Amino acid sequence: MNKVFPQGENGYTAAESKAHPGGEAGGGHLCCSRRGACLSASLLLLLATVAALIALVTILGLPSCTPGAQACITLTNRTGFLCHDQRSCIPASGVCDGVRTCTHGEDEDESLCRDVPQSLPHFLVAHCGDPASWIYSDQKCDGTNNCGDCSDELSPVTVCPPCGPGWWRCPSTFFKYCDCIPRHLCRDHVQHCSDWSDEYACPGP
């Protein structure tokens, strides 16, 4: 007498199901599930790594790779140095002056100050008529003889604007100034202009 096995909904008998426990019907789903779990774990690990790197850059305030990204314009409309907080703009002459002005001290960083002016970004440096002399870029066209030969004020390459309202134009007798003197020096009974115009023509401040 033949033994009859009950049939399931899919037409397979119970014996056939037991005879193939690792067949395609069950084993394929298990393999796919394991592969999906591995992919999910790898993706989560990658996302966690990226998030950690972003947090590190944000916390430590790592510097920009390009020196040009550190340039800015100060409140006095002069070239400045942008601190790593991306908010503080300090004067060019405040870089490598021995005083840490930026929060993280990047304005006094060894990479900037190890061989001044060669180690400074180009936007912080202005060259004088004497090739051996240089000044900070914010000292150009400020009315003061910073180069010593007035090339930072009178050179055709410099192209400085005319004397401002707080200045009097004349050939100065003082080494500190070039072709303009501050108006507060007018009519102080001291000759500041070679033509004495500071005492007789300048209306004063």
From Swiss-Prot:
Subcellular location: Membrane
CC per GO annotation: membrane
Organism: Homo sapiens
Family, as annotated: Belongs to the LDLR family.
Membrane topology summary: Single-pass membrane protein
Higher taxonomy: Eukaryota, Metazoa, Chordata, Craniata, Vertebrata
One Pfam family recorded for the sequence: LDLRAD1_C
Protein name: Low-density lipoprotein receptor class A domain-containing protein 1
Keywords: Disulfide bond, Lipoprotein, Membrane, Receptor, Repeat, Transmembrane, Transmembrane helix
Occurrences of domain LDL-receptor class A (ranges): 71-114, 115-161, 162-203
Entries under SUPFAM superfamilies matching the protein: LDL receptor-like module
Stretches that traverse the bilayer: 43-63
